[in-house]
């Protein structure tokens, strides 16, 4: 089995296992499928942004009751770009939650609105600036971009200015705050949806 075939088999197997675990846990296969699809959408946000930056990226690997992850190597990539890759997952997951919310509202489906609530909640929590979470990766990228010297010197002579890099840090930080606010607004708007 080739490396990519193994990745596809792992994706399918771990997706199915997560689907079964969530379906049994919530007692509804539709909810289980929707929840695992929301996680998949989140991970494909990372994949699309990583590929947009020319990186090789793995297919998602699901971990039942925890989530999923993708791997990529970002050596040489500007820190603000790695921050964007980190934020792309919660952004895509938030869009998926909005779609579930719209469908749930249109069809008066409590389980879809509850699915949207959990999508907003988990993506918002994932933005906490902590360690391995996406928020931690974004925060590190912003801080590392900002902390680079604004002017680089060689032998006492200024040779390069990185003001554009610092402006990127500000732009990514604004995106971070706006995304977090949007996800929290989604949590608050759907929190009384009740169990399905």
Each PLM stretch: what is its role?
Residues 1-196:
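Hydrophobic transmembrane alpha-helices and their immediate loop junctions
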